[in-house]
């Protein structure tokens, strides 16, 4: 816990001082910590146990964002604004948290300004991670669209060997030529297709269909 990135660069006695601003909270297994849409009031540091962060979509489907253990932080945006929580948090097992409320945070950084720098560094790192995740999600979406375009051609009786250029397939899939090239090479490495000069051959039609509908 004292190795948390929030305390990076602090002397041991400064870490103890910082921890004195936190309030202890106990959550039994399965108890919600906060819900998506709640007004944020505190940052939480996991002292023991495990926490699941998840987002609920309009259809009620839950998507797990992270599983957090001792020494990890969540809810940090609430220290910077009074906006709504973007996700829900629940205790996966009996969990002890240390809560840092906004007023206590402001008092803490007056004593230990490095904590504010560490929080900014943590937010920057998470922003980079979010950007990377968006790139990965965009690639997965493009992968599905390219697979669906190939599946349509296959169902039209034009395959399994297609005479098609990357820019033509890009137009069918609604993506860029560069993205199509990346997706096709990934599918070739998986053995789903075989690539040749100006050709794409479907080798695993069943797997292609699963990819097209997001099942693989």
From Swiss-Prot:
Effects seen without this gene: Decreased expression of genes downstream of the TTHB186, TTHB147 and TTHB159 genes. Decreased expression of TTHB178, TTHA0771 and TTHA0176 genes.
GO cellular component annotations of the record: cytosol
Subunit structure as annotated in this protein's UniProt entry: Homodimer.
Signal peptide: none
InterPro entries: cNMP-bd_CS (IPR018488), cNMP-bd_dom (IPR000595), cNMP-bd_dom_sf (IPR018490), Env_Response_Regulators (IPR050397), HTH_CRP (IPR012318), RmlC-like_jellyroll (IPR014710), WH-like_DNA-bd_sf (IPR036388), WH_DNA-bd_sf (IPR036390)
UniProt keyword list: cAMP, DNA-binding, Nucleotide-binding, Transcription, Transcription regulation
UniProt GO MF annotations: cAMP binding; DNA binding; DNA-binding transcription factor activity; protein homodimerization activity; sequence-specific DNA binding; transcription cis-regulatory region binding
Organism of origin: Thermus thermophilus (strain ATCC 27634 / DSM 579 / HB8)
Stored PANTHER family: CRP FAMILY TRANSCRIPTIONAL REGULATORY PROTEIN, HTH-TYPE TRANSCRIPTIONAL REGULATOR ARCR
Record's protein name: Cyclic AMP receptor protein
Residues binding 3',5'-cyclic AMP: 75-78, 85-86
Record-listed a nucleoside 3',5'-cyclic phosphate binding positions: 6-126
Any GO BP annotation: positive regulation of DNA-templated transcription
Main function: Activates transcription. Positively regulates six promoters upstream of the TTHB186, TTHB147, TTHB178, TTHB159, TTHA0771 and TTHA0176 genes in a cAMP-dependent manner. Regulated genes include clustered regularly interspaced short palindromic repeat (CRISPR) associated (Cas) genes, and the genes encoding a putative transcriptional regulator, a protein containing the exonuclease III-like domain of DNA polymerase, a GCN5-related acetyltransferase homolog, and some T.thermophilus-specific proteins of unknown function.
Positions of the DNA-binding region: 166-185
Pfam families xref list: cNMP_binding (PF00027), HTH_Crp_2 (PF13545)
């Amino acid at each position: 816990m004292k190795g948390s990135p929030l305390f990076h660069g602090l002397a041991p006695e400064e870490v103890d001082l910082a921890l004195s601003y936190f309030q202890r909270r106990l959550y039994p297994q399965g108890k919600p910590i906060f819900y998506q849409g709640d007004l944020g009031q505190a940052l939480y540091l996991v002292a023991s146990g495990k926490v699941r962060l998840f987002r609920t979509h309009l259809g009620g489907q839950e998507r797990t964002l992270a599983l957090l253990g001792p020494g990890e932080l969540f809810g940090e945006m609430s220290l910077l604004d009074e906006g709504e929580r973007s996700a829900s948090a629940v205790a996966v097992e009996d969990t002890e948290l240390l809560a840092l409320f906004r007023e206590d945070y402001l008092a803490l950084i007056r004593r230990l300004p490095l904590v504010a720098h560490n929080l900014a560094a943590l937010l920057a790192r998470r922003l980079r991670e979010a950007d990377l995740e968006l790139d990965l999600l965009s690639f997965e979406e493009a992968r599905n669209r390219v697979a669906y375009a190939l599946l349509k051609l296959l169902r039209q009786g034009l395959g399994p060997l297609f005479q098609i250029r990357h820019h033509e397939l890009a137009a069918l899939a609604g993506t860029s030529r560069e993205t199509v090239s990346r997706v096709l090479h990934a599918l070739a490495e998986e053995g789903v297709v075989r690539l040749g000069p100006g050709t794409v051959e479907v080798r695993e039609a069943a797997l292609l269909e699963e990819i097209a509908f997001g099942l693989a």
